[in-house]
UniProtKB/Swiss-Prot annotation:
Source superkingdom: Bacteria
PROSITE patterns reported in the protein's UniProt record: COMPLEX1_ND1_1, COMPLEX1_ND1_2
Disulfide bond sites: none
Alphabetical UniProt keywords: Cell inner membrane, Cell membrane, Membrane, NAD, Quinone, Translocase, Transmembrane, Transmembrane helix, Ubiquinone
Membrane spanning residue stretches: 21-41, 95-115, 124-144, 172-192, 197-217, 257-277, 281-301, 317-337
Gene designation: nuoH
EC assignment: 7.1.1.-
Compartments reported by the entry: Cell inner membrane
Official protein name in the record: NADH-quinone oxidoreductase subunit H
Function according to Swiss-Prot or TrEMBL: NDH-1 shuttles electrons from NADH, via FMN and iron-sulfur (Fe-S) centers, to quinones in the respiratory chain. The immediate electron acceptor for the enzyme in this species is believed to be ubiquinone. Couples the redox reaction to proton translocation (for every two electrons transferred, four hydrogen ions are translocated across the cytoplasmic membrane), and thus conserves the redox energy in a proton gradient. This subunit may bind ubiquinone.
Organism the protein comes from: Magnetococcus marinus (strain ATCC BAA-1437 / JCM 17883 / MC-1)
InterPro entries: NADH_UbQ_OxRdtase_su1/FPO, NADH_UbQ_OxRdtase_su1_CS
Pfam families hit by this protein: NADHdh (PF00146)
Similarity comment: Belongs to the complex I subunit 1 family.
Length: 343
């Protein structure tokens, strides 16, 4: 594969010149990265509906195509052909900009995700920090949508979502600190390679548990979907959106679900490393997909199983339970590392 890519690059430089080929090659890499992500996001919606249907003893989508396999395409066509309605009192520029900001920040994070030692768009030394920064920017799009809609339900949903994302991002970030301490790097590839022989999910199990619950809350998924609580806020910050402006929020949410699942796999479950050395003949990207799929399954299972939290319970859990525990966990891991070094 490396030789094939090198030959393509050599041909491109020969025909287009180094400057133009660099631009074309960058665009090609971005397209090759984004296309599978959008495909996975689209069919994750079908997987969710089928899985929840199974858990609720019903069929789920089964009319469009064989076993409903074309349902996501039908939904995409429906969103594309619908008219984008702008509320009369909305701030129009910000109203359109908000879903674009949310969707773009959800995709930009993928630039630093390594799918294998060689398969990464941008191998930066601060990959973890970059992903956390991009996830923080997503809160601005949601808050902006609530404000720009200029309606009560949307504003309340935007404020709820921003507060929730900021609250749980703190504990999520703190749970990643022990992983960085053990690996000695912010580079995702180095963190995966440091887990040879022992995945960090085993010695850092409490942190892994808090990480998973925190990312469920940060992505506004059930049972923490307070910003979109239908019984209270109609549809929260998405109330006034339709067509592809609504679709961008929808795609951004599911792209974030896959993103935090991949990040959890890389940080705690060994990424592309096999569980035992005897299975190393299986390509690393297969292991990464399997581990990510397991985490995504738990996202969907939680939605079908648990009732929604009250907002005060949600905030109390984040600030009074997870934040102190994650801080104490950093201290415990640091103390254990110090004592082991002394021994």
């Amino acid at each position: 594969m490396a030789e094939f890519i090198s030959s393509i690059q050599a041909m491109g430089v020969a025909y287009l010149g180094e400057t133009l080929w660099t631009l074309v090659w960058t665009i090609l890499k971005i397209a090759v990265l984004i296309a599978p992500i959008l495909f996975c996001v689209t069919y994750l919606t079908l997987a969710e509906r089928r899985l929840i249907g199974f858990m609720q003893v019903r069929l789920g989508p089964n009319r469009v195509g064989v076993f409903g396999i074309l349902q996501p395409l039908a939904d995409a066509v429906k969103l594309f052909v619908k008219e984008t309605m702008l509320p009369a009192k909305a701030h129009r520029t910000m109203f359109i900009l908000a879903p674009i900001l949310t969707f773009s920040t959800a995709l930009v994070s993928w630039a630093v995700v390594p799918f294998s030692p060689e398969l990464v768009l941008a191998d930066v030394n601060v990959g973890v920090l970059f992903i956390l920064a991009m996830s923080s920017l997503g809160a601005y799009g949601v808050l902006l949508s609530g404000w720009a809609s200029n309606t009560r339900y949307s504003l309340l949903g935007g404020l709820r979502s921003a507060a929730q994302m900021i609250s749980y991002e703190v504990s999520m970030g703190f749970t990643l600190v022990p992983v960085i301490m053990l690996s000695g790097s912010l580079n995702l590839g180095d963190i995966v390679e440091s887990q040879k022989g022992l995945w960090y999910a085993l010695p850092l199990l409490p942190g892994f548990f808090i990480y998973f619950i925190s990312v469920v809350a940060e992505t506004n998924r059930a049972p923490f979907d307070l910003p979109e609580a239908e019984a209270e806020l109609v549809s929260g910050f998405c109330t006034e959106y339709s067509a592809m402006t609504y679709g961008m929020f929808f795609l951004g949410e599911y792209a974030n679900i896959i993103m935090v699942s991949v990040l959890g796999s890389l940080m705690f479950l060994g990424g592309w490393l096999p569980p035992i050395e005897a299975l190393s003949f299986i390509p690393g990207i297969v292991w990464l997909i399997l581990k990510t799929g397991v985490l995504i399954f738990f996202f969907l299972w939680l939605r079908a199983t648990f009732p929604r939290y009250r907002y005060d319970q949600l905030m109390r859990l984040g600030w009074k339970v997870f934040l102190p525990i994650s801080l104490a966990w950093i201290f415990i891991v640091g103390l254990a590392m110090h004592l082991l070094d002394m021994a």
